[in-house]
């Protein structure tokens, strides 16, 4: 559905999908999709799903309070690598922390305010820019005001 409320049917090719990108207008809402899969042995599929879950449990803070991946990968680099290189692994501001386990995840330690999370993210962005010249782009959609400046719908 586009911004005017008109319904569209779009092919996969027209969507121009790439990493963290879709070629359609940002204000469109997707109401359904047809996904193509292939049949497989249920036991093998379950085994593979379990392997993926276990790998994530080792590498990501899946049991912590996070908003998921914080910054998009600045191709060809990986966000966690430039964050780590800038010395931000485990960085804590108020109740917010860059995960020591996977430093592209911000963790709410239990008492983080929106300001703590914003300040931590912006501090990481500044340190990464200073350390290696990379501009990290927020992957988390932020809504509201920060220090008197509207950030509704902005990616930073």
Give the predicted meaning of each segment:
Residues 2, 7-119, 126-156:
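Phosphate/pyrophosphate- and phosphate-bearing ligand-binding catalytic cores of soluble enzymes
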């Amino acid at each position: 559905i586009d911004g005017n409320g008109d319904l569209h049917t779009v092919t996969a090719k027209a969507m121009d999908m790439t990493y963290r990108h879709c070629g359609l207008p940002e204000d469109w809402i997707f109401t359904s999709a047809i996904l193509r899969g292939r049949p497989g042995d249920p036991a093998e599929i379950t085994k593979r799903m379990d392997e993926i879950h276990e790998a994530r449990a080792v590498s990501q803070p899946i049991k912590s309070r996070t908003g998921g991946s914080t910054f998009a990968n600045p191709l060809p680099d990986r966000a966690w690598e430039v964050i780590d290189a800038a010395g931000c692994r485990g960085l804590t501001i108020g109740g917010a922390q860059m995960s020591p386990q996977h430093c592209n995840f911000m963790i709410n330690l239990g008492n983080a305010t929106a300001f703590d999370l914003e300040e931590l993210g912006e501090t990481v962005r500044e340190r990464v820019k200073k350390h290696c010249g990379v501009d990290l782009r927020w992957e988390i959609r932020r809504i509201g005001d920060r220090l008197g400046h509207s950030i509704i719908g902005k990616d930073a």
